[in-house]
Amino acid sequence: MTKAKSDKLTLKHIIGYGAGDCGGCFGLYMVSMFMARFLQVNLEVNAALLATILLIWNIWDAVNDPLMGTIMDICFAKAKPGADKFRPWILASIPIMFVGMVAFYAVPPMLGGGFATIAAAFILKIVFEAGYTMMNIGMGSLLGNMA
């Protein structure tokens, strides 16, 4: 007699999900905790300008998250039957987050704190956060499918 397949999550799956989500959050907090200090102290960005940039970023982030979810749904609708919906996005986000985080803190101070420095830092933050959004939406949606 064959045993019925159980839909219960194993400890391996629970730990694997938690470890994956922890990795993404670790990267986000590395950038978020030190970003303002790095930009002000190392790159000499004015605090008022930094606050304005962060306001603009948060408005973009409010639009970006649903947009990324829609892109994932559209791409999955065109995928072959049986294809993973979230795994490709989670795996693609890893190098994007890594490159974005390393490059963000490698913005050369020789740019002098002017427009070039601010633009470079802002673009690199967008790159990092795009990778984080890909990973976070994939992981968050995966949780609903696992349950």
Predicted regions and their residues:
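Membrane-embedded alpha-helical bundles of multi-pass transporters/translocases
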Residues: 2-147
